[in-house]
From Swiss-Prot:
It is found in: Microsome membrane. The lineage of its organism: Eukaryota, Viridiplantae, Streptophyta, Embryophyta, Tracheophyta. The keyword Oxidoreductase applies. It comes from Manihot esculenta. One of its GO terms (molecular function) is monooxygenase activity. This is Valine N-monooxygenase 2. InterPro entries: Cyt_P450, Cyt_P450_CS, Cyt_P450_E_grp-I, Cyt_P450_sf. The synthesis of cyanogenic glucosides is mainly in the top of the plant and then cyanogenic glucosides are transported basipetal in the plant to the tuber. Belongs to the cytochrome P450 family. The gene is CYP79D2.
Amino acid sequence: MAMNVSTTATTTASFASTSSMNNTAKILLITLFISIVSTVIKLQKRASYKKASKNFPLPPGPTPWPLIGNIPEMIRYRPTFRWIHQLMKDMNTDICLIRFGKTNVVPISCPVIAREILKKHDAVFSNRPKILCAKTMSGGYLTTIVVPYNDQWKKMRKVLTSEIISPARHKWLHDKRAEEADQLVFYINNQYKSNKNVNVRIAARHYGGNVIRKMMFSKRYFGKGMPDGGPGPEEIMHVDAIFTALKYLYGFCISDYLPFLEGLDLDGQEKIVLNANKTIRDLQNPLIEERIQQWRSGERKEMEDLLDVFITLQDSDGKPLLNPDEIKNQIAEIMIATIDNPANAVEWAMGELINQPELLAKATEELDRVVGKDRLVQESDIPNLNYVKACAREAFRLHPVAYFNVPHVAMEDAVIGDYFIPKGSWAILSRYGLGRNPKTWPDPLKYDPERHLNEGEVVLTEHDLRFVTFSTGRRGCVAALLGTTMITMMLARMLQCFTWTPPPNVTRIDLSENIDELTPATPITGFAKPRLAPHLYPTSP
């Protein structure tokens, strides 16, 4: 019996071994087949694009110098974004190709071509450039927005969409945002009580800073703030550093295109970004480190804000999903990405509305009709505030926060708008050019909210890319809901709670642009007078 068992076992083992070998052979054959098919497809694509490169021309553009391309023009004609805009205007084109060093930069101001890139060829243009400023701000590419298309990006984007910026999380954080909407009214009302004008830029930027700090850290201030509800020195440093970093990130730095010059800082941008990044981290990281320790020690057991969510995320083995560096850098990127768009749109919208009282009156009338004058406007009212949202949407169109969107790098050769775009090219959508394109927008320089009104609900997203709000595609902003909420609530509270006029002795708000960025040259300032019953205004911060 023992011999039979042994023989059977030997036979079974032999059969298993043979079966295993057969399976291995099958796997190898399948793998080989897939590899051959993939290679054939790649070769066909390569041949197709080689043919395309012969059949389709490169986009028009200035003649590059040998080796350095159009770097001399980039340096000579600062700010570079205005030179590019004028170049495209002079060439009468909605797409061009400018060579900086070995990099092909492709600005686009046509919505049809923009949709080709972010919709039809979204997968091809999903990469990001590797440059020093992006590497610095992301802690070595640990985040989402500026990170190349790789596994780290996929991991962090999944965290954001499923755990941080989801509709359920948005609802969970409602009360924190509501506190900051009340705080905004408290601050502006105190300016009136002190007979001061309201600097809308300060109010808007620090509302945004307060909201994201409250959602992230459960605190409005790093320090004590000011008695009137305004920002303290720490908050001013924080927000100023964020806007400085944004100004120089993808700011046509010489070393972005001639990387062998990295570290020499020939145009001074590298040092500026490093210092701004240090300021942001010096204020935020101690809070993050303290909270991580509280969870590790068991001192903290309940989630209260987004920082708690980041820290308590677990992988399939029950271990922390994110390490401290990933948490710190992703939080820094969220801070940088949250404040600028809402603040810029509201500042410009308020300037335009104060200068056009008939439009301001229509927005106020809508608020009185939808909300009434017996309570303050709330997030639940947003779907019904079409005119208010149209005012914000028109500010996005006419006065974008940045000249260009974050670059989309081509991961392979492509044909866009009947032009050949080589692999490695940076496609940059011109927010300025798209929103002011006369082929898309009649009378494009006129601020006219009513061009956005239709029979349905007005939304701030713009998937047809006739202008850029939160972009679209796999590299689009994942926080459109939060952005829409912040912008609409900020603008609605300002308009519902106060009557706005130019400051005393001023007949019209100056709406000229800064030379080196797209903010108003002079911060929008107005005189705000309460228009509701006194008991509706918050009396404490």
